[in-house]
């Protein structure tokens, strides 16, 4: 693709949409934040030739206070429609991202709640741990072009500052526990029992957790799975030592015993950085057990927990997109089935 849809959308907003909004809705515009943010590969800067087959086109995302949205949001979105050109820079505006205007407005508090589970910037351990990391990305990504009140800017800035250190450590501990206990240990048991079904599940999850741990050690949010590896390649410290292990491990031709060995070496790399960063203390080299395998990172899990505040130890991070899925289910339930099939590019065969 020769031109990013984000760049085109920014120009469209400045040249076409913003003058209309300032003229017809000056008070509402002053209360609204505009940009491109949220969901979609283009917001991550990862759009390519495949991205344009669904939910594609000029897009301006906007968030305003919920009360204002309920009163004026839908009116604004519909009122700009007659003033929109059919196309802009070769893009069909009326077939774009938001279905006819290029402008997608929602309530700020509702948007936050359906993305990270709270309607404000995180202010407590529970707030931080209740927000799925891959959905924090959908608040901080993209671009914000106008936010005169600074409400959304404030939320973005708090999240862009990354986790408070105790929260980061609690998350690292949780991932160490799962990589080791539900990953490498589980794979060892699956191999011993010749259970390839279970081996496939636990191996895939373990590789995912190892790469996500690399992001935590670098103090960077990981994105959703489709783009995790692309951003993994940008990590300044962990990519170089982990990538050869990950790349060999995920090859289908790599035997199960070798996959387990590679998981164990990933654990060594992560453990090295945990010690180097002062997260855990230096320790002796542990031996691999013939039936339990190499539960190295569960040593780190326990040590980190011991040093955490008591009120944080029992808080479990939310890592699935539970808040967004609740919203998505309501969205899909409100569509005609034919419309949903069209969005999925499902058409009757010949």
PLM region descriptions:
Residues 21-61, 65-67:
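Active-site nucleotide-donor binding segment shared across nucleotidyl transfer reactions
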Residues 70-192, 244:
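Conserved NTP/Mg2+-binding pocket subregion across the NTase superfamily
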Residues 64-69, 193-197:
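A generic structural motif
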Residues 1-6, 59, 188, 193-195:
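Glycine- and acidic
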Residues 15-30, 91, 153-166, 210:
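Membrane-interacting alpha-helical segments
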Residues 1-19:
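N-terminal regions immediately upstream of nucleotidyltransferase
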Residues 137-314, 323-325, 329:
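Conserved nucleotidyltransferase catalytic core and NTase-mimicking acidic/glycine-rich helix/loop elements
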Residues 312-350:
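Extended, compositionally biased alpha-helical segments that mediate assembly or anchoring
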